[in-house]
Amino acid sequence: MSSNFKTPLSVYVLYDKDNTKGSETYEKIYHLLCRNSSRPFEDGLDIPVFFRTDMANQIPPIDINFSNKTIAILLVDDNMYCNTIWDEYIKELLVKEDNGALKIFAVKLSKYAFDINPLLQEEQFICLKNENIETDWHEFQIRLYDNILRYLKSYKVGQKLKLFISHSKKDKDHLGESTAISLRDF
């Protein structure tokens, strides 16, 4: 492999060190996008997933040269909102986003999340019914995948995505067919 190789996509999960679910949420996202290390024979998406948090009053930078496209997922809870270290860091991320170097998705885990930075647009937020990734895990996965697809394909918010879903028409319980029909009619 040459030293010029870049992975197509990398994802960074950012959370405040005082977020009690931050590390656990990072691991779940890692298993979702990269692979589940406790099941080594299962295939995964193999998207590199890294974390960033505010240890020792600093946050390591995101390496935008590692991949062709980079996503930063901000887990915006009350701790991140109240921590001034994140203010500058998010400003730096927004500059990189303006330059096309990365895309920011913020997850609303606090009623104050929209106020963390006025330059973060509401469309950039993944909003969950209960503001809790653990209880809204299925909803979070759908919204995350939707945002990733839109970013990779340069789709705008509101623009319809077209997906091809392969299914078996001969499965005994007809689960594949019924799932395909329900998705088609969604």
Where are these regions (language model features)?
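Conserved N-terminal substructure of TIR/SEFIR domains
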Residues: 1-75, 93-100, 131-186
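Amphipathic helical hotspot of TIR/SEFIR-family domains
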Residues: 68, 74-112
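Short glycine-/acidic-enriched loop or helix-start segments at secondary-structure transitions
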Residues: 83-86, 116-117, 175-176
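Residues that flank catalytic or metal-binding motifs in active/ligand-binding sites
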Residues: 103, 121, 161
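Conserved beta-strand scaffold positions in the cores of enzyme catalytic domains, especially
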Residues: 104-106, 124-127
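Acidic metal-coordinating catalytic centers involved in nucleic-acid phosphodiester chemistry
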Residues: 108, 116, 128-131
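Glycine-rich, charge-decorated loop segments at or immediately adjacent to ligand/cofactor-binding or catalytic sites
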Residues: 112-125
